[in-house]
Every structure is written in structure tokens, then in C-alpha cells.
Amino acid sequence: MRRVIYVDSGPVSDGHIPRPDLPADVVEIDLPPLDEMDAMGASLDGLDDNARQRFQDWALPHPAGTLREPIPLRDPRRNDTPATMICCSITSDTVRQLAAAGSDMFAPVAQLNHVTFVDLPTGHWPMWSRPIDLADAISAAARD
């Protein structure tokens, strides 16, 4: 592997469980209505009405098991793989500050030995709000 590219996301800690609250009988999680996501603080910035509709039309359920189980990370060499973080809903400066402060969600960023940051200001779903800019950023990172 030559590079890991994170899009408005980042590495997690060993054993991290994204949604430990999910009951065992939940198999899939549907995309909530976008107005509910807005109310919960999900970053929908940059999504016009057409993009919101496409997002809802194309959304597929997320397998619940992938959110309920611990994520095992056994090989510390993962931190030596070059990484690019494309920062959309928060700036790269904020990501760096949170990582340096040891914030639970961002602490693994500080463990990356070769990370570059790209700011692409928009919401959490740049594939809907800025698809060409996102494709350009991924392409540039892949050539790095």
C-alpha cells in the first residue's frame, strides 16, 4: 500500500467500537432523514436541494455489525504508511490541534509518521457537494 487517503475522517484507535450502543438485533442502519441529521449537527454544508435528493436516493443501509464490533489494529507499521487527510467539515488546523491535545477522536492522527493535510471546506459529504474538487484532491494525493 502506497498511501491511505482519509476523506473527512481519520484513523481510529485499536479496539475502537464506533457504535457500542447498537442492540444486537439491529442488522442494518438506514440513512436518517436529512432534516434529522441537520438537527443532530451532522455537517450537510454545501448540499443544495438536488444533492440532498441524490444523497437520499442513492443511500444504502450500513451493516450494523461493522459499527458494533471492535476494530482490531495489530500492526504498528500502519503508522508508517503515508497518509493524506482531506479535511472538509473541520479545518486541518483544528484536526492538528485536537490530535496534539490528545482528543479521543483525533489522538490516532498524532501517531501517523507521514501525514499531509488538504483543506476542502464543505460538509461531511464532499462527494455530493464538491465532487470534482474531491476527485482532484484524491488524484493529487494518489500521485504523491
Please annotate each region the language model reported:
Residues M1, R74-D80, A110-L112:
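Short, conserved loop/helix-junction motifs that constitute active-site signature segments
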